[in-house]
C-alpha cells in the first residue's frame, strides 16, 4: 500500500501520522512516560485504529527527543530519523502549501523555524511550551 508513518517521540506526548499518496491519514497523540513504550504503543494503536497491516507500511520516520532511544528498525520496517526542526518545517510547508513561513512549534518548549523555499532552519525558541504548562497543571 506504500504508507509512510511519521512519529514524533516527544518528552510528554508522542504524535503519529501516516501519509499515503500525498494524503494525511488520521494523526493521533499518545501520552506515556517512557519514550520506547510511547513509540511502540502509538504505532500499534495507529495501525489498529486505521486497519493498517505492517505489510502496508513502506517506511517509518522518527523524530523528537525520544527518537534517540530508537537504534534500529521499528517492527522490522525500514526506519529513518530526521531532525525535529526540519520535520516541523516540512510538515508545515506540506500542510499550508506555503514556501515561505515562520513555523512555531509548541511542545514541552516552543521553537521557531524559518522556511524559505528549500531552506529550513531553526531560528530560536524558549524553554516553556504546552508540555510545560500541562506538567504544571
Name every feature range the model reports, one short phrase each.
Residues 8-12, 65, 104-109, 128-130:
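A short acidic Gly-Thr/Ser loop motif
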Residues 38-45, 69, 90-94, 135:
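Alpha-helical scaffold segments in soluble metabolic enzymes
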Residues 2-8, 57-62, 101-105, 125:
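Short glycine-aspartate micro-motif
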Residues 118-137:
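Glycine-rich phosphate-binding loop plus the immediately following alpha-helix
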Residues 29-32, 43, 48-84, 119-122:
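Short beta-strand-loop/turn "lid" adjacent to the catalytic site in phosphate-handling enzymes
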Residues 3-41, 120:
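Short glycine-rich, Thr/Ser-proximal phosphate-binding strand/loop in the N-terminal lobe
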Residues 70, 75-104, 109-119:
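Conserved phosphate-binding catalytic cores of ATP/NTP-utilizing and phosphoryl-transfer enzymes
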Amino acid at each position: 500500500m506504500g504508507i509512510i508513518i511519521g512519529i514524533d517521540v516527544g518528552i510528554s506526548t508522542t504524535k503519529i501520522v501516516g501519509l499515503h499518496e500525498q494524503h494525511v491519514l488520521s494523526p493521533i497523540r499518545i501520552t506515556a512516560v517512557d519514550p520506547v513504550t510511547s513509540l511502540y504503543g502509538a504505532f500499534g494503536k495507529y495501525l489498529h485504529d486505521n486497519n493498517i497491516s505492517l505489510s502496508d507500511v513502506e517506511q517509518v520516520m522518527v523524530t523528537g527527543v525520544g527518537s534517540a532511544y530508537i537504534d534500529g528498525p521499528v517492527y522490522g520496517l525500514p526506519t529513518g530519523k530526521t531532525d525535529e526542526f526540519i520535520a516541523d518545517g516540512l510538515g508545515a510547508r506540506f500542510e499550508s502549501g506555503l514556501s515561505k513561513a515562520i513555523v512555531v512549534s509548541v511542545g514541552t518548549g516552543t521553537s521557531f523555524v524559518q522556511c524559505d523555499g528549500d531552506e529550513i532552519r531553526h531560528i530560536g525558541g524558549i524553554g516553556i511550551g504546552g508540555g510545560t504548562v500541562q506538567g504544571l497543571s
